[in-house]
Amino acid sequence: MRRRRFRRRRAPIRRRRIRRRRTRLSRNIRGHRRSSRIYYFRLRRKDKITLTQATNDFKFGTGIFTFKLADVLTVGLNAPTLKVPFEDYQIALVKVEMRPLGVDITTWKGFGHTVPMYDARLKTFQGQVDLGDDPLMDFDGARKWDLRKGFKRLIRPRPQLTIADLATANQSAATWFSGRNQWIPLQVSGNSLFPQKVNHYGLAFSYLQPQPDPMYYECEVTFYVKFRQFAWTTLNVPPTPNIEGMELMHICNGDCNQCFADALDPDSAVDSE
């Protein structure tokens, strides 16, 4: 007797349910209702740097860069100070670029080093000249730069503040902000408070002092600043419409993957030359 062959029933095809992406924002983040909205601005400043000539043969000098918001709120000589209608700010990144003026690139001028320093020790290298050796060449993070070409360096500055609330009188200590807690309030009461002048450290550079004439450099410092909590009406004097020098880069709600402060690595994004 022949066996009957039964075909196995195939399991029904389960169709995956495709969920459509919501194009309408939730109620609490529409418009300006969310308080964590962050505004990114690019602010620039230019200066002339002079490297003084050496009094003796083969001497080194050093210089420093510190950064504060007040440096870029005035766009030129005798220009009005830019008023910023935000509650808090944070200097996320700074790019320093120095290029020589009127230098013959075919003649060797020597080289120096650039080193990021994030505390007040940076000021010990301010304006030193006639040094017997390069004091920055053995620092961790030092990069060589050619005096004929200049340098370009991107750093993540850090504000160092002084506190006087100690167990002993007439003494002070230093503290740093963390990356998450680095917001500095702009709108403060009192005429003696200047949050725009908080020093952010910093960059030190060394160089072989030129001979027989000094060398001149054009220096462009670019600030990448984050602001939060737009507050147009909280200023004592309403802001002027003069926004020259300010370039709005990006607005987000704080968790965006395109934010330069989270996606950019200061150690590898811009190499010194």
Curated annotation (Swiss-Prot):
<keyword id="KW-0945">Host-virus interaction</keyword>
<dbReference type="GO" id="GO:0019062">
    <property type="term" value="P:virion attachment to host cell"/>
</dbReference>
<feature type="region of interest" description="DNA-binding">
    <location>
        <begin position="1"/>
        <end position="31"/>
    </location>
</feature>
<keyword id="KW-1140">T=1 icosahedral capsid protein</keyword>
<keyword id="KW-1048">Host nucleus</keyword>
<keyword id="KW-1163">Viral penetration into host nucleus</keyword>
<dbReference type="InterPro" id="IPR038652">
    <property type="entry name" value="Circovirus_capsid_sf"/>
</dbReference>
<dbReference type="GO" id="GO:0075509">
    <property type="term" value="P:endocytosis involved in viral entry into host cell"/>
</dbReference>
<dbReference type="GO" id="GO:0043657">
    <property type="term" value="C:host cell"/>
</dbReference>
<dbReference type="Pfam" id="PF02443">
    <property type="entry name" value="Circo_capsid"/>
</dbReference>
<keyword id="KW-1160">Virus entry into host cell</keyword>
<keyword id="KW-0167">Capsid protein</keyword>
<comment type="function">
    <text>Self-assembles to form the virion icosahedral capsid with a T=1 symmetry. This very small capsid (17 - 22 nm in diameter) allows the virus to be very stable in the environment and resistant to some disinfectants, including detergents. Essential for the initial attachment to heparan sulfate moieties and chondroitin sulfate B of the host cell surface proteoglycans. After attachment, the virus is endocytosed and traffics to the nucleus. The capsid protein binds and transports the viral genome and Rep across the nuclear envelope.</text>
</comment>
<dbReference type="GO" id="GO:0075732">
    <property type="term" value="P:viral penetration into host nucleus"/>
</dbReference>
<keyword id="KW-0238">DNA-binding</keyword>
<dbReference type="GO" id="GO:0042025">
    <property type="term" value="C:host cell nucleus"/>
</dbReference>
<dbReference type="InterPro" id="IPR003383">
    <property type="entry name" value="Circovirus_capsid"/>
</dbReference>
<keyword id="KW-1164">Virus endocytosis by host</keyword>
<dbReference type="GO" id="GO:0019069">
    <property type="term" value="P:viral capsid assembly"/>
</dbReference>
<dbReference type="GO" id="GO:0003677">
    <property type="term" value="F:DNA binding"/>
</dbReference>
<feature type="region of interest" description="Nuclear localization signals">
    <location>
        <begin position="7"/>
        <end position="35"/>
    </location>
</feature>
<keyword id="KW-1161">Viral attachment to host cell</keyword>
<keyword id="KW-1162">Viral penetration into host cytoplasm</keyword>
<protein>
    <recommendedName>
        <fullName>Probable capsid protein</fullName>
    </recommendedName>
</protein>
<comment type="subunit">
    <text>Homomultimer. Assembles in the nucleus, presumably in an immature form, then migrates to the cytoplasm once assembled as mature virion. Interacts with Rep; this interaction relocates Rep into the nucleus.</text>
</comment>
<keyword id="KW-0946">Virion</keyword>
<comment type="similarity">
    <text>Belongs to the circoviridae capsid protein family.</text>
</comment>
<dbReference type="GO" id="GO:0039615">
    <property type="term" value="C:T=1 icosahedral viral capsid"/>
</dbReference>
